[in-house]
Amino acid sequence: MSAGPLQAAPKKNYGALIGAGPAVGGAAFNRTLSEVASYERSRRDHATPDYRIKIVVVGDGATGKTSLLMSYTQGQFPEDYVPTIFENYVTNIEGPRGKVIELALWDTAGQEEYSRLRPLSYGDVDIVMVCYAADNRTSLTNAEELWFPEVRHFCPHAPMMLVGLKSDLYSLDALDRLVDPTDAELVARKMGAFVHLQCSAKTRQCLEDVFNTAIHTALYDELRAPPQRGVKGMFKKKQQRDPQAQSYKRVRKHRCVVL
């Protein structure tokens, strides 16, 4: 696989990978917390990583998307809400077999007035996180009725996950006003999301699981067990000598549409 951004592969059985157990929050990746940096600046100033993964985070405004990314990349939870237009966060990860992964996280604006600018974020995306807030049932409805159609329009083949934010609120008593996780699971199935996870940026509960799952999915082929020796292994090696067999690794196929 080349050092370029990974291609979304819709035909892979992501469900099998996630359902196997270790993938969801599976083998943790060693991260280097970085300062906020633009994706392009990171590519220019730092040594070329072995892999680049781009994750775009979408959802209603004030659901906690920015807090999610800041908590993961910087270990900080912002106390004050500041509406986001566009922000990029970059963190380096030690991936499988000691490979270095550059994880580019794109934060988008959920407000309607930015709907014409938001599609610019979808280019070359590897994973899309559609987010809702545990204390906002409307945000879950919009995940299915607003964000899912938008993502599928601009990125018809990008793997998509449904992520519930502010999960720490479930520890309080006012459960009647929170999103029922069963309803969220149903929405995830309707959307065709490969997984539904909940996390808290404030307490960091399951935060690493969310991103580890996204990374495992983007690196699906790399994380699969190597072929066994024997006839099957010899056939596999023969396939790898064929340039066409390595088109996934060498050629960047742009599958997202930006109008």
Swiss-Prot record:
Modification Cysteine methyl ester, positions: 256
GO molecular function: GTP binding; GTPase activity; protein kinase binding
Residues reported to bind GTP: 59-66, 107-111, 165-168
UniProt GO cellular component terms: cellular bud neck; cytosol; incipient cellular bud site; plasma membrane
Range of residues in the leader sequence: none
GO biological process, alphabetically ordered: actin filament organization; maintenance of cell polarity; positive regulation of formin-nucleated actin cable assembly; regulation of actin cytoskeleton organization; signal transduction; small GTPase-mediated signal transduction
Keyword Cell membrane: yes
Lipidation (S-geranylgeranyl cysteine): 256
Compartments, as annotated in UniProt: Cell membrane
Top-rank taxon, per record: Eukaryota
Motif, Effector region: chain positions: 81-89
Family matches, as InterPro entries: P-loop_NTPase, Small_GTP-bd, Small_GTPase, Small_GTPase_Rho
Membrane topology qualifier: Lipid-anchor
Disulphide linkage map: none
Similarity-based family: Belongs to the small GTPase superfamily. Rho family.
PANTHER family recorded: RHO FAMILY GTPASE (PTHR24072)
Protein name: GTP-binding protein RHO4
Organism: Eremothecium gossypii (strain ATCC 10895 / CBS 109.51 / FGSC 9923 / NRRL Y-1056) (Yeast)
